């Protein structure tokens, strides 16, 4: 019964695959919970810096930091911070955000603008290289708990270029975490900082600060920290989205494997039944011939 043996081999192979996808689903679920905790833990820090910086900026309207406005002599070039994953098996997560990046690049190209990019994650780096984009720096293999130092080094290339007037905008591209079942690709303007980004929450007091050494130095440092916090938050959200998408993808793969095993077992049983029926028919026919 060669056909039956072949089907049994397929069933065994799919069962082994099912065990792997189930294990990957459980690992992704555990990592997702930790990634969500890191994502939520980063929000209060960014919110507090935003409120303090907003109050300082409103109290000193005569000073405009380079991050808050576009230089009149800025080059017609935009910078992109593209956040993707290092690994695959997470559904269409990377495809969706890279499609959004491509759309923005084409829009800017139609307006006569050039683009430079920093890639965070192997998938984005590979994509940008394939389409011939100018990648000025990158950060990969960040692990499950990224450190700010490893992120800011590459991104600072774009921040410095913007401050020097070599770029007229910087865009942050990542996947925003909505919930376990839904993630949203985002291409948002990082620089110049939009007015709503530097808006104090309702109920926040506008304190009369004393500055040491001076207001300009404090605002300069806080704005840099705020931009760093926005980038870290984007990476944290992208990682939470990655693990959620991977968990869902592996669950779907496990469910599909179970369905396929059921179908293969049905085929095997039918094949086996057909073989038994054939053998019985041959025995009966032989007995009838002898009789």
Swiss-Prot record:
Gene Ontology biological process terms from the UniProt entry: proton motive force-driven plasma membrane ATP synthesis
Keywords: ATP synthesis, Cell inner membrane, Cell membrane, CF(1), Hydrogen ion transport, Ion transport, Membrane, Transport
Membrane topology, record value: Peripheral membrane protein
UniProt cross-references to InterPro entries, sorted A to Z: ATP_synth_F1_ATPase_gsu, ATP_synth_F1_gsu, ATP_synth_F1_gsu_CS
A GO molecular function held by the record: ATP binding
Family matches, as CDD domains: F1-ATPase_gamma (cd12151)
Coiled coil: none
GO CC annotation, single: plasma membrane
Localization per Swiss-Prot or TrEMBL: Cell inner membrane
HAMAP family: ATP_synth_gamma_bact
Quaternary state and interactors: F-type ATPases have 2 components, CF(1) - the catalytic core - and CF(0) - the membrane proton channel. CF(1) has five subunits: alpha(3), beta(3), gamma(1), delta(1), epsilon(1). CF(0) has three main subunits: a, b and c.
Function, in words: Produces ATP from ADP in the presence of a proton gradient across the membrane. The gamma chain is believed to be important in regulating ATPase activity and the flow of protons through the CF(0) complex.
Homology family: Belongs to the ATPase gamma chain family.
Name recorded for this polypeptide: ATP synthase gamma chain
Annotated gene: atpG
């Amino acid at each position: 019964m060669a056909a039956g043996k072949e089907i049994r081999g397929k069933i065994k192979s799919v069962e082994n695959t099912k065990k792997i996808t189930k294990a990957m689903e459980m690992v992704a679920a555990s990592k997702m919970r930790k990634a969500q905790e890191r994502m939520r833990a980063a929000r209060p820090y960014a919110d507090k810096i935003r409120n303090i910086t907003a109050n300082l900026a409103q109290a000193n309207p005569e000073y405009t930091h380079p991050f808050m406005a576009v230089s009149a002599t800025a080059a017609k070039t935009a910078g992109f911070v593209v956040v993707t994953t290092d690994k695959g098996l997470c559904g269409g997560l990377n495809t969706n955000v890279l499609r959004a990046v491509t759309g923005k690049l084409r829009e800017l190209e139609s307006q006569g603008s050039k683009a430079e990019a920093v890639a965070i994650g192997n998938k984005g780096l590979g994509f940008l290289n394939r389409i011939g984009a100018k990648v000025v720096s990158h950060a990969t293999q960040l692990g499950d708990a990224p450190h700010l130092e490893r992120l800011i080094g590459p991104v600072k290339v774009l921040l410095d270029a913007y401050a020097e007037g070599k770029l007229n905008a910087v865009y942050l591209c990542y996947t925003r975490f909505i919930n376990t079942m839904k993630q949203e690709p985002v291409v948002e303007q990082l620089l110049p900082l939009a007015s709503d980004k530097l808006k104090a929450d309702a109920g926040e007091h506008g304190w009369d600060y004393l500055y040491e050494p001076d207001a300009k130095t404090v605002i300069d440092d806080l704005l840099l920290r705020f931009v760093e916090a926005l980038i870290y938050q984007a990476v944290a959200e992208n990682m939470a989205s990655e693990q959620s998408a991977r968990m869902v993808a592996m669950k779907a793969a496990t469910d599909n494997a179970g369905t396929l095993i059921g179908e293969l077992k049905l085929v095997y049983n039918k094949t086996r039944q057909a073989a038994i029926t054939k053998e019985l028919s041959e025995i009966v026919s032989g007995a009838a011939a002898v009789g």
